[in-house]
Amino acid sequence: KVYEQIESDLIFALQLPDTYDKSDLGRVTSNAAEALLAKTYLTNKKYNDAKTHLNNIIITEKYDLLTDIKDVFDVNNEMNKEILFAIKYSKTLIDGGHGMWLSLSDVTLGHFSDVLKGAYNSDDARAGLLEYKKSGSVYLPMKYYDIQDVSTKDVGNDFIVLRYADILLMYAEVLNEESFDTDINSKNSGFYYLNKVRDRAGLPNLTSLEVPSQSDFKKAVLNERYLEFPLEGNRWFDLIRTGTAKEVIKAAYDIDIPDYRLIFPIPSAEVEKVNNPNILPQNPQY
C-alpha cells in the first residue's frame, strides 16, 4: 500500500513544471519526480516502467555528466547540469546549513571505513571526495566542503538527492534486467551507460571479459553505485533492492542481520495515534 501511494503521488507530480526561475530554484521539477518514480519502479522490479521513465529523462538532453566529478559538488557550481534535484541550504541563516560535518572532538567517530576507502582504484577521481578537510572549527568531507560561516558556524552546500549519474546507472541496471547485451558501443546495452560513469571517474571500460554474465553485470552496477554515491543516501536502498544487504554487511563487518531488520519500524508515535493493530500493526518483531 505504501508503494502504491508513492507511485500515485509521483505520477501526479509529473504535472509539475520542468523548470523554475531563479526565485523558485530548488523546487521539485517534473524531471525530478520522474526520476524518483523510475527509482520506485526499479525497487519494485517494474523494469519496463522504470526503463520508460529513465529514457524520458535521457532523451530530454537537459542533463549530462560534468567532466570533473569535483565540480558536481562545488559550492560555487550548485544546480549544475548534472543535478535533477537538490535540497538547498544557506550557511548565513541560523539553522539554514546542513550537518555533513564533524566537530574537532568527533573527527575520529565519523571516518570512512577501510572497506570503502580500499574499494577505490588508485586512479579513481572519486576517491579524493572522501577526504576530510578542516573548515573553521569543523571537518568536512571534500564532497561537501564549504568555508564555514563566521557568524552561524555553519556550512551551506546543497545536498544532492538526484543526479544524472544515478539515471545512467539505473538505466544500465534496467537494460541488464531486460537482456545481457555485451556490445559496449550500443545504446541498448547496459555496458554503454555503466562505462559513461566509469569514464568520468578516469577508469577503463568494462567489457564481457571482466563481466561475463548478467548476474556479474548486476554486481558491477551495484559496485559502481557504491563508489559513485557515498554520503548521498543511496547505499542502504541499493542493498535492499538487490537483496544483498545481509551478505554485504556480513562480509564487511562480520555482523549477522536478522531479516526483520531489513525494514524499519513504523514510528511508534504513528502506531499510538491509531492505537489499533488491526488497522496499523507495527512491523514484525519491533
What are these regions (language model features)?
Residues 104-127:
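Short, cationic low-complexity segments
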Residues 1-94, 125-286:
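Acidic/polar-rich alpha-helix caps and helix-coil junctions
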Residues 93-112, 232:
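Acidic-aromatic pocket-rim loops
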